[in-house]
Regions:
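Active-site histidine-anchored catalytic micro-motif
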Residues: 1-144
Length: 144
């Protein structure tokens, strides 16, 4: 098992991390196995998407309809929650992340991610404004 934690400061909602992951796989010299990419943040996700600008806008709009940022959420009632005073009002972000997924598992074949023609790995930040985010890469090497 080979692991690495990557740092990220998301400047946008969708960040393509495919090249970073493939670079790590190439450096590991693993030819056959499984790559697990995950985040430990409750308002961030890892998903396979087509890297098309309008599709990403459609996804943003879809998530906004399901969990509007303008709605009132109990999570945001800081008077009734026991949280630090600097806690963010981000109930919508948690709900959006819950609808997505915090990890993806992709086969490694001949030292490369076995992705479909249009598939790319995206880090999705549901709570923009956060800094120093991370995602983890775990490689399980197959039988040689």
């Amino acid at each position: 098992m080979i692991t690495k934690q990557e740092k990220l400061i998301p400047k946008k909602e969708f960040t393509n991390i495919t090249k970073r992951i493939q670079r790590f796989i190439s450096q590991s010299k693993v030819k056959k196995g499984i790559c697990l990419i995950y985040t430990k943040h409750t308002t961030a996700c890892i998903r396979l998407l087509e890297p098309e600008k309008l599709l990403k806008q459609d996804m943003h709009d879809f998530l906004e309809r399901l969990a509007p940022s303008s709605c009132k959420y109990r999570h945001d009632d800081l008077e009734h929650r026991t949280v630090p005073p600097e806690e963010r009002r981000n109930g919508y972000s948690h709900l959006r992340a819950m609808l997505l997924n915090h990890q993806e598992t992709i086969p490694i074949i001949n030292g490369k991610l076995d992705l479909g023609k249009w598939q790319r790995i995206f880090y999705i930040e549901c709570d923009l404004g956060k800094e120093d985010r991370t995602f983890n890469i775990l490689i399980l090497e197959g039988i040689k």
